[in-house]
Every structure is written in structure tokens, then in C-alpha cells.
Amino acid sequence: METGYMQVVKSWLEGNFDEATKAQIRELQQNDPVGLEDAFYRNLEFGTGGLRGIMGVGTNRMNKYTVGMATQGLANYMKANLEGPLSVCISFDSRNNSPEFAQITANVLAANGIHVYIFDKLHPIALMSYSVRTKKANAGIMITASHNPKEYNGYKVFWSDGAQVTSPVDKDIVAEVAKITDPSMVKFEPGADAAPIEVMGHEMDEAYLNSVMTLMLSPEAVAAHKDIKIVYTPIHGSGVEIVPEFLQKLGFENIYHVPEQDVVDGNFPTVMSPNPEEPSALAMAVAVADREGADLVMATDPDADRIGIAVRDNEGKMVLLNGNQTASILTYYILRRWSELGKLDGKQYIVKTIVTTELLRAIAEKYGVKVYNVLTGFKWIADIVKKNEGETTFVCGGEESYGFNVGEFVRDKDAPISCAFVAECAAWAAAQGKTLYQLLQDIYAEFGYYKESLISVTKKGKAGLEEIAQMMVDYRQNPPKELAGSPVIKVIDYTKPEETGLPSSNVLQFYNEAGDVVTVRPSGTEPKIKFYFGIKGADADAKNEALRAQFSK
């Protein structure tokens, strides 16, 4: 008697699958039975964020069949729930198979009578979001696995506002995709009655750049300091053309590249991980900065939604800023310039996530700008923008995980515009005789020193997941009495929407008298429980050590 997954293997070997796929399955049978089981023991889950998985043959892998099935489910949902004519914009990053998966997605949508707009080559998420809004499309799809390892790819679904889908649409799409149980249910080939597939080229880039240029705040400072030396690396990803073009359009003249990392390559050969949060991913760019005497390094990940930066400290050494520090500098710069230009009238707001530094709130309060605190994930920032559209103005928003956006043209993390504002802010600081590092110290001097850190505790297997669940129960029933020696004065339980005003989420926050906050949440994607520390005060380093000891037991 064959086990369940072997029956699925047999159906792929005997079914209407291409010969290359069958050959790879036979190779796994002979040489890697464990890998074979992992590839077929379940279906790759289409979750509320779309698909993400290792590429390869099988039901539990990203391949043309699983991508086709996801697209057919999405097409079925759109046709059943939206008024026609329907259209979708598609973009893709530099990962292996991204162009092929994008083309398969386009073919399936067209075969289902849905008009497709697809980029002619790799483009950042920001351009996909912008194109959805510009073309007034019903949805958008980005083929990417963000900064995951090279073995991965993914499929993100966006809605007509250019933001990732949220409830209830996300769950309804998931349910529709789940009904597509076999590739034979997919219309892979567009027939004579197919909708058109229209290619988008540089004209969309120009439209995007012309739009976001209207948001810039200090052209005089840039003109006076156009010679500041900037090193930019796309880390083999989709920022490779648009970011340098944006910086040049702003007027910057000394943009240095890392030639090896300007090569679009889904194997990311020069880095361990294409993640701008990792110091090693910026090492080559920092070396160029040291060689050329540059004061600023900027890096973006494969889909160009996150930005990592390095700046020169007072000793002349390049130091990496974390996502909270970059968001703080940008928020301070943008709100101060809005204030100086007379653009603030009480109808502006910023958005941060609940695990992002409270320094953003302190800065916004100084300028009389409202702050929204939302759940983790940029889709919740975009959700606030959608709800306030036409009433109040979104200035900027960010999260601790290196994502930031400015203005309402794009509804997701936008690394190209983040790079532009970091560069403009550097020029503005230079006009005052300061570096970005010194500007950050000035911000701390004015608003207080804020330090953020994170610990992740891994609990493996089924027992580990049960232990994590029990830890959350224990923290709810017996919250800590003190944090780093200061009494806890407030507990927020995000499973209670009636109290938070946010969708229910398994997150707890503890605030102490000193103004520190600890956020506890299980990871949505890994067997981990995460503790985020937001610490305020001159003794932040000591308090950080105390909290790490308190919560890593």
C-alpha cells in the first residue's frame, strides 16, 4: 500500500506534466527519498500573504504548476466577486525563475479573460504598487521572496489600492485557491479568446519618478551638495536601475557602484544572504566607501522594499544604522522640513507598527502630527492610508524591519524613495555642517536616547509550538511585575480588538513607569517566540542587558 505522498508522486509521474519535471522526480526517488517526501507530503500553503517556498518539483514547492494553481484560484475569485472588465499588474524580482513564474501568471490570467500589464524586466515592489494605481487595475502580483535565501521564491497578491490584501479579501482568496487541487484545473495556455498581455516599460518608471519627485523637500540643499559621495548596491536585485536613476534625477553626481553586485543574479553570489539588515550584505559597499571616501552607503534587497544604510561616525568609521534609526532620521527630517515649509496644518499623520521605536511618536508629537500604531506588516500601514484617503494626509511611515515609505503614491515599503530621502537628508545635514550620524545624535539629544533590540527564542517541533502557546498563556495570566527594575503600569493584549481598535493578533505589550516597552509575539513563519525591547533613557544599554536576561530564560 502506497503512503499518501507516494500516491501524489505517482500521479505526477503518470499525469500531464512536462518531461523535465518527471525526470527531476525520478532523480529524487533514486538519490534523495527524504527530499522527495518533503516535496510532496503536503501542498504549498497559499496564506494571507500569498505563496512562499523553496523552488523545485512537487506540491510543496514553488514551480510552474503551483504558481499556475494559485493564479487560477485568484482568477476564479476575481471573476466571481468583481465587476469586469478585470485587469492585473505583474512585476518580478531577480530571483531564479522569477521571470518564468511571472509569465506563467500572466498566461493563466489572460486565459481567464483578465487583462494583464506585465513589466518588461525586473522591477521593485514600489513600481508594481504604483502601476496598479496608475492603470486602475483590480489587483497586482509580485513574484518575490523578499530577502529569503536563494532557494526560495514567492508570490504576493496586492489589491486595487496597490497594497497587500487584508481581511476579509485575503481569506476569501485563500479559500478559492484551496479549491484548485490539481494542475489539470488550470487554464495554462491563452486561447483565441484570451485577454491581452500588455508590456510595461520605462514609461512607467518615468511616471513614478515624476510623481515621487513632487514629494522631495530640499532641492537647494541637494544643488549645493550634489557632490557628496554615495555608494549604492542593489545586492543583485531589482533596485539596480531605478535607484541610481532616481539619485541622478535629484541631482547627485557622485554615485559609486559595487560592480559585482550590480549583476542581476538570483544566486546572490557575493553575499551569504541578500538582506540589508545583515552587516555582511553591506561589506563590499562599505569597502568601496572607504576606498572612495564616501560618507553614505545604501543597500536594497532583491525586491527593493527594504533599505539598509551605513554612515560615518565622528571617528570616521562606517557604522550601520538599524531600521528604527533610519526611520527616526527620515521622520525627523521630513516633519521638520514640512514644518519649515508651512505644510503642516493639523491634518497630517504618520504610521508606525507596534514594535517600531516610540521615538517616532515623540518626534511627531513635537510637530503636532497624529501617530497611528498598527500591527506588524506594512499592509496595516497601507490600510490606514486607505481609510484616511481624501480626509487627512499620510506623510510617512515605517517599521523596525527596514521598511519605509513617503507619500501616498505607493502603498508598500518603497526602498527607491527611501534611498532618495536618505540622500536628500544627507545633503540637508551637510548644508548645516553635519553628517547623518551627527543628526541622529542631535535627535537623541532633543528627544531622549532610545534603544531597541530583539531576542528570538527557538522552540522546535510540535512540542516547541505547544510550549510557545503556553508561554503566551502564562504571560497573559501572570504578566511581569517589573521591567528592568521599573514597575509595569500597563499591559496591552492585542487579542482584544475592542480595547486596541486593531484586528486581533496574538501579541502582548508591557509598559513600565520608566517609559520602556516589551512586546511579545510568536513568529508567524518560524517556531520562535520574539521579544522586542523598546528602551528609553541614558541607562538604556544597562536596561537592555537586564531585559535580555529577564526574557531569555
Locations of regions flagged by a protein language model:
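Conserved phosphate/anionic-ligand binding catalytic regions in large, soluble enzymes, centered on
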Residues: 40-60, 146, 230, 234-246, ...
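Phosphate-binding and adjacent anionic-ligand microenvironments
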Residues: 290, 294-296, 317, 337-521, ...
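An N-terminal, well-structured beta->alpha segment
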Residues: 8-105, 195-226, 238
